[in-house]
């Protein structure tokens, strides 16, 4: 029996396209129209749809907070669905929303103590036997490296905990680059 937890360090909001937000907002608007026509949620959905369709200008400015919220919510529910499909219980799915990521731009902030402390708190709560972390440092946006640095900094602070003596950290790749053969310690065929 394995007690699996999945932690998402970032919201992934900027990876969600505007068309997806429009689609979900249209769905939300239509549901509100049917069941709660005077809803502020319906008004917000319409506002976001109109902004993305007619007003948004790509000028290097940070994304609007309400649009980022919708994008993050879409990504969060995709992740939650994937975890459920894989048999991970809802209360074992953790969305850390590390602050370094929340700039509304491709360029992110530097890792902070707050980011590290969020990861550390989760490690102390779960006390994992194994951790699987993205070791894909070829990520052109640098997000995977900052996330890995957050985990490694948190591990450094909890390394003397009793449960850490038997904890193993595994790094995986795939999204941006594969491992070189001489760097592979263990391969799992899937």
Q: What spans do the regions from the language model cover?
A:
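Active-site beta-strand->loop->alpha-helix modules in alpha/beta enzyme cores, enriched
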Residues: 1-163
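A short, structured beta-strand-centered segment in the mid-to-C-terminal lobe
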Residues: 184-189
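Short, flexible loop segments at boundaries between secondary-structure elements
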Residues: 156-183
């Amino acid at each position: 029996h394995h007690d699996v937890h999945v932690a998402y360090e970032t919201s992934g909001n900027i990876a969600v396209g505007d068309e997806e937000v429009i689609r979900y907002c249209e769905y939300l608007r239509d549901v509100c129209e049917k069941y709660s026509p005077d809803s502020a949620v319906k008004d917000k959905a319409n506002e976001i749809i109109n902004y993305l369709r007619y007003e948004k200008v790509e000028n290097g400015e940070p994304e609007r907070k309400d649009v980022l919220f919708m994008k993050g919510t879409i990504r969060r529910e995709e992740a939650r669905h994937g975890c459920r499909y894989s048999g991970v219980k809802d209360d074992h799915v953790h969305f850390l929303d590390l602050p370094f990521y929340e700039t509304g731009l491709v360029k992110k902030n530097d890792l902070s103590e707050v980011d590290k402390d969020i990861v550390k708190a989760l490690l102390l709560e779960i006390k994992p036997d194994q951790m699987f972390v993205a070791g894909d440092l070829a990520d052109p946006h640098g997000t995977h490296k900052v996330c890995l640095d957050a985990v490694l900094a948190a591990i450094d602070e909890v390394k003397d905990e009793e449960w850490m003596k038997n904890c193993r950290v595994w790094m995986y790749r795939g999204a941006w680059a594969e491992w070189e053969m001489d760097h592979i310690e263990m391969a799992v065929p899937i």
